[in-house]
């Protein structure tokens, strides 16, 4: 005991001068060798150890072309670097799956979350979340290509008249020149809109669209296309389940041994999530169309050049939003058709289940009737096995008569169990219980 007291006094004399003085706090590192510290990660486990996010930046250069680069940011530094409040940034964060699609209009910025793409749009740059995602990569390629084509359209529009005149002079026919001109325009439209989505915005505003509207349109198009692909995938799964069910229709126990109902419930839950996302996106577009201030504040390039918001015509933005609203309505209609197909198929599955239950009940009734009839015949035959004197065994025809009775009774029992439905109807008619 005396030894431990001396050791504690010596340790206190060594430790206190170094711990109390802030200048000599570095020398206390060697004390960790003599202390047993618990790991904080084991006590308080962190779920999200990786707080970094890969951002795709698309910036418009002075010559009009796009400068694309990927940057890795910390989520803690992202609000300060992008100058966006944390409350708004949380709504479009791809790591948070609890929020629905949103379109937020703030000062000099548009915040967009469609369910597949989350982006921050300014008048001269765009920040896309999750730069390694395939949809984001496709959006980046489309934005850069369309910016190049907008620059090339200025020279093409000047040379279109000269091309038509040269074609007319060579062929001496104005009709052929017009047809060739239509082919040139159709090729350009197909190159711009290869997403199989009707894009009226670029048809009427080719080469005149602002950068923010270009990014908004491409992100919305790609997201709607992804919604269509998900809906088609769900539709294919439903078809496969229906085909499996048709193959097993001849099996009486098919609905009780397979997992079709469980798979259908999973598909229905996924379809419900998809409908909620589409409905949220649709309501956000409608809110912007009904709010004139938000419509005017979305002209970021115009507001950057003109500080005073004197904008009167918002027709190009209305065309853009109404086009995507129409596409979401059509997609929502297709989704409702798939839901009706699922409900119809569920009703058929329930009817099949009821039919199988009735078959089991009927089988149980047949077994009970057959056991009743065979028990009666067994009672008759058991008379020969008794040790009592009943004077039946002395007769020469007794065995023949009893065997004929048992065989006839068994035939009657088989006939009754085979046509048990008529027997049950007879019991129901005369209230036999």
UniProtKB/Swiss-Prot annotation:
Membrane spanning residue stretches: 360-380, 397-417
InterPro entries: CorA_TM1_TM2 (IPR045863), MRS2-like (IPR039204)
Coiled-coil annotated spans: 257-298
One Gene Ontology CC term in the entry: mitochondrial inner membrane
Residue numbers on the Mitochondrial matrix membrane side: 418-433
Localisation per UniProt entry: Mitochondrion inner membrane
Membrane topology: Multi-pass membrane protein
Any GO molecular function: magnesium ion transmembrane transporter activity
Assigned keywords, A-Z: Coiled coil, Ion transport, Magnesium, Membrane, Mitochondrion, Mitochondrion inner membrane, Transit peptide, Transmembrane, Transmembrane helix, Transport
Ranges of the Extracellular topological domain: 381-396
Mutant lacking the gene: phenotype: Severe decrease in the number of sporozoites in the mosquito salivary gland. Normal asexual stage in mouse erythrocytes and normal exflagellation of male gametocytes.
Superkingdom assignment: Eukaryota
One protein family per Pfam: MRS2-like
Record carries keyword Transmembrane: yes
Family: Belongs to the CorA metal ion transporter (MIT) (TC 1.A.35) family.
Function (record text): Mitochondrial inner membrane magnesium transporter required for mitochondrial magnesium homeostasis. Involved in the development of the sporozoite in the mosquito vector midgut.
Protein name: Mitochondrial inner membrane magnesium transporter MIT1
The organism of origin for this protein: Plasmodium berghei (strain Anka)
